[in-house]
Curated annotation (Swiss-Prot):
Reaction catalyzed: (6S)-5,6,7,8-tetrahydrofolate + NADP(+) = 7,8-dihydrofolate + NADPH + H(+)
UniProt protein name: Dihydrofolate reductase 2
Signal peptide (UniProt feature, chain positions): none
Principal EC category: oxidoreductase
Gene: folA2
CDD domains, A to Z: DHFR
Domain DHFR: 4-167
A GO CC term assigned to this protein in UniProt: cytosol
GO annotation terms (biological process): dihydrofolate metabolic process; folic acid metabolic process; one-carbon metabolic process; tetrahydrofolate biosynthetic process
Entry keywords, A to Z: NADP, One-carbon metabolism, Oxidoreductase, Plasmid
Pathway(s) the chain acts in: Cofactor biosynthesis; tetrahydrofolate biosynthesis; 5,6,7,8-tetrahydrofolate from 7,8-dihydrofolate: step 1/1
Length: 167
């Protein structure tokens, strides 16, 4: 079975995904969507994203294999799987036999996985927000919108890859 790699993110109208290690907005419907989508699947994140989650939840994301990409794996708790490369992250996820693995941030990790992603699930916010972290630039000619669910202040949009980023 081939594992699908999906990037999932909430992105402001100006591309912002974070500010000072936090998400600069609160939309409960989006958090519910994130949880319902990722529970039971491996999630890959960078160390700073993990630290933000650990601060908010007092631990890793529950009911998910938390794979943390870091240069200092010895500094992470045993409750997560620490890896030092994207290849190792994908291998750990594949070992879980999950059909889909979700990349959940931050910006550098999204950028590293974008070329190999099969799917993007983006919460596209109508408003712009101040922040210091942005989603990487996407070549939209490689992606097709497959599904859109519109809410009052955002839309959840699923895109699938139609061609490779590497030419």
């Amino acid at each position: 079975m081939c594992m699908k790699l999906s990037l999932i993110a909430a992105v402001a109208a100006n591309g912002v995904i974070g500010a000072g290690g936090d998400i600069p907005w609160q939309y409960p419907e989006d958090l519910t969507h994130f949880k319902e989508t990722t529970v039971g699947h491996p999630v890959i994140m960078g160390r700073r994203t993990f630290e933000s989650i650990r601060r908010d939840l007092d631990g890793p994301l529950p009911e998910r294999l938390n794979i943390v990409l870091t240069t200092t794996p010895h500094q992470l708790p045993d409750s997560v799987t620490a890896v030092t490369s994207t290849t190792a992250a994908v291998a750990e996820a594949a070992d879980s036999d999950a059909s889909t693995t979700y990349v959940i941030g931050g910006a550098t990790v999204y950028e590293q996985f974008l070329p190999q992603a099969d799917e993007l699930i983006l919460t596209e916010l109508a408003a712009a927000f101040d922040g210091d972290t942005v989603f990487p630039t996407v070549d939209w000619s490689n992606w097709t919108e497959m599904e859109r669910t519109t809410h009052s202040e955002f839309a959840i949009v699923r895109y699938t890859r139609t061609s490779s980023d590497s030419a």
